[in-house]
Amino acid sequence: VSCEDCPEHCSTQKAQAKCDNDKCVCEPI
């Protein structure tokens, strides 16, 4: 998942979107 789609991708998992080296990382809230 790209950074651009990260927020949408993570919100489905009730997680917070973070970007690491242009990769999507979801952090649990």
Curated annotation (Swiss-Prot):
Disulfide bonds join C3-C19, C6-C24, C10-C26. This is Potassium channel toxin alpha-KTx 8.1. Keywords: Calcium-activated potassium channel impairing toxin, Disulfide bond, Ion channel impairing toxin, Neurotoxin, Potassium channel impairing toxin, Secreted, Toxin. Has the structural arrangement of an alpha-helix connected to a beta-sheet by disulfide bonds (CSalpha/beta). Negative results: does not or very weakly inhibits KCa2.2/KCNN2 (Kd >1 uM) and KCa2.3/KCNN3 (Kd >1 uM). Pfam families: Toxin_6 (PF05453). InterPro entries: Scorpion_toxin-like_sf, Toxin_alpha-KTx_8/9. One of its GO terms (cellular component) is extracellular region. One of its GO terms (molecular function) is potassium channel regulator activity. It is found in: Secreted. Expressed by the venom gland. Blocker for the small conductance calcium-activated potassium channels (KCa2). Belongs to the short scorpion toxin superfamily. Potassium channel inhibitor family. Alpha-KTx 08 subfamily. The keyword Secreted applies. Its main location: secreted.
